[in-house]
């Protein structure tokens, strides 16, 4: 009886762990080092179609991630991308962080068994030269049958924290 209970417990644990992991595929550019002493601003991308507030929540999550790396980043609410940022605004910052939402799937029903999905490309530009300093892509999926992520934005923190923790000194 103890063996059966141990087996059932082990089987349940393996199934539960397999069903609650989140998978990330990360594509990073060549490593570069950015200084947390310099000034950063984050553009607010356009919302993904039919996903209200996806742009602002993405930028706010990146702002939290950068704060965890010791960077006080401002949000540029009026600018959806680097090209739209005015020269006057660029003069105030050393780097502009541009998130681009390529795919966003928010499966609202937690118990539906459907995963939240996100494909996000984050580019950091040096404002003085418009040079791309870093490009980082997060391709993430919550694979929980039982407990989905609350929102695709929840899939940003872990891979972004690891990446920016390595390059911001």
Describe the function of each predicted region.
Residues 8-16:
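Bacterial N-terminal signal peptides
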Residues 16-71, 165-169:
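A structural "domain/chain start" motif
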Residues 19-38, 126-169:
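C-terminal/domain-edge helix-coil "capping" segments
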Residues 46-52, 109-110, 144-150:
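Second-shell loop/turn segments in exported
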Residues 11, 32, 88-91:
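Structural motif
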């Amino acid at each position: 009886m103890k063996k059966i209970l141990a087996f059932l417990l082990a089987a349940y644990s393996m199934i539960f762990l397999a069903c609650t992991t989140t998978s990330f595929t990360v594509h990073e550019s060549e490593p570069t080092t950015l200084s947390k002493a310099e000034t950063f601003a984050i553009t607010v991308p356009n919302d993904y179609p039919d996903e209200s507030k996806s742009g602002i929540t993405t930028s706010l999550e990146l702002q939290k991630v950068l704060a965890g790396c010791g960077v006080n980043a401002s949000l540029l609410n009026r600018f959806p991308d680097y090209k739209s940022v005015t020269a006057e605004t660029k003069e105030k910052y050393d780097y502009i962080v541009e998130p681009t939402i390529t795919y966003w799937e928010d499966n609202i029903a937690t118990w539906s068994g459907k995963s939240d999905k996100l494909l996000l490309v984050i580019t950091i530009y040096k404002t003085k030269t418009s040079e791309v300093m870093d490009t980082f892509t997060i391709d993430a999926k919550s694979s929980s049958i039982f407990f989905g992520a609350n929102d695709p934005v929840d899939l940003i923190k872990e891979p972004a924290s690891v990446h920016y923790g390595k390059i911001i000194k």
